[in-house]
A protein has these predicted regions:
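N-terminal auxiliary segments of SAM/dcSAM-dependent transferases
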Residues: 1-41
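Hydrophobic (often cysteine-bearing) scaffold residues that line and stabilize catalytic clefts
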Residues: 7, 62, 91
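Conserved alpha-helix/loop element of class I SAM-dependent methyltransferases that forms part
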Residues: 12, 16, 46-50, 56, ...
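Cytosolic histidine kinase catalytic core of two-component systems
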Residues: 23-24, 64, 110
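Residue-level signal for inorganic ion chemistry
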Residues: 29, 69, 160
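Glycine-rich loop at the start of a catalytic domain that most often binds anionic cofactors/ligands
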Residues: 41-42, 53
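Conserved nucleotide-cofactor-binding alpha/beta core module
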Residues: 74-161
Length: 161
């Protein structure tokens, strides 16, 4: 499979059509190899408009959703960002491309380890993945310039607001 062509098509046909037009975000999406963040069994689907199972009952966001989240934060490069739900680390990597620092919390230890490995393999050095429950745990580094919920929650964690 030609992942470079698939990545280009994803940006042009999925991301731009969702009004994600910020050049730095588009550039990050164009350069970040999403297939590294997807389980091997699903790599052929890495650039499709679908959620991808990560195991442990968790799903990787569809590319356009991850892109829209990163876009709507309007990060300028000086922010410290908290991400709740790191998953495989793809959204973490996108956020790291546009911020000073990302602290990502992941409740599943195996996924936290996977995210750390994926970030390291991608050369992302200013993002940290911790095993923690974002619904209850608050990193000492707060307050944060932006907080992203990378998964669904029954209600927003009040301690973060």
């Amino acid at each position: 499979m030609n992942f470079e062509q698939a990545r280009f098509n994803m940006v042009e046909q999925q991301i731009r059509t969702w009004n994600v037009l910020d050049t730095p975000i588009l550039q990050a999406l164009s350069c970040l190899p999403r297939e590294r963040f997807v389980p091997v069994a699903y790599q052929s689907l890495a650039y499709t408009d679908t959620e991808i199972p990560l195991g442990h009952g968790q799903l990787m966001l569809a590319p356009k959703v991850a892109a829209r989240l990163a876009h709507d934060l309007e990060l300028q490069g000086s922010e410290t960002v908290l991400e709740i739900g790191a998953g495989s680390g793809y959204l973490t990597a996108l956020l790291a491309q546009r911020s000073k620092r990302v602290i990502a919390l992941e409740i599943v230890p195996e996924l936290a380890a996977l995210a750390r490995a994926n970030l390291a393999q991608s050369g992302i050095t200013h993002a940290e993945v911790r095993v923690a429950d974002g619904a209850h745990d608050t990193p000492a580094e707060g307050p944060f310039d932006a907080i992203v919920l990378g998964g669904s929650v029954a209600e927003a964690p009040q301690h973060l607001l």
